[in-house]
């Protein structure tokens, strides 16, 4: 069975729209919550859309930067961005109103390889933009922020990055899509963040040497006006075109209780980062 049929054809997908009103830490807590629900067979697969204002989501490796406080001071005091540490992925990414995040949560244990889980997201994104005259490539864009094997790019310019996380029998695959605005300006901001947070110090972990010109938004790459709302519609149409069956089952009481636990963990993780900077 091909992956499109396995994950979409006749498969129920529960759509959660969190495109407004949430704080970033809440988003990561919700993904863990739904991941566990799917893993325990008490929820259909989940697709969740989320958008956040002016936040840099740092990875685990970023929390070990030698001058992290200086980097965060630059983001907050000079640029007006908040910074938090997430629970998936290793390096920082930029979120704002022009960046659409999509999370797919589905059941999977060790038999579901990391590459297979990433490919499910790639298939969906490819379907969303199949009417555009472009080739979407999957390969690491070395000089982007948060470079990875499953970076998505057009003509060598990265517009999206994918991470995944596994929680209690469920898999969450998360993508950020740089839709509106300037991808290179976002990359310049991250380049400057690392300059402040490293100050030229040599570290065991190799942080990205960012070249802003290797990143761009879909608006730029497709050479047309496209909004995050447009892409949200493309997402839902793509799931239906692949044979998926959408529903909008509300969050259950049990999920709200589990969410509280995961949210507390996110708060604790970020408190540790703040304490380390004192």
From Swiss-Prot:
BPL/LPL catalytic domain sequence ranges: 41-247
One Gene Ontology MF term: lipoyl(octanoyl) transferase activity
GO annotation terms (biological process): lipoate biosynthetic process; protein modification process
EC category name: transferase
Positions bearing the site annotation: Lowers pKa of active site Cys: 158
Substrates-to-products reaction catalysed: N(6)-octanoyl-L-lysyl-[glycine-cleavage complex H protein] + L-lysyl-[lipoyl-carrier protein] = N(6)-octanoyl-L-lysyl-[lipoyl-carrier protein] + L-lysyl-[glycine-cleavage complex H protein]
Family: Belongs to the octanoyltransferase LipL family.
Further remark: The reaction proceeds via a thioester-linked acyl-enzyme intermediate.
Protein name, as recorded: Octanoyl-[GcvH]:protein N-octanoyltransferase
Naturally occurring in which organism (per UniProt): Staphylococcus aureus (strain NCTC 8325 / PS 47)
Lineage: Bacteria, Bacillati, Bacillota, Bacilli, Bacillales
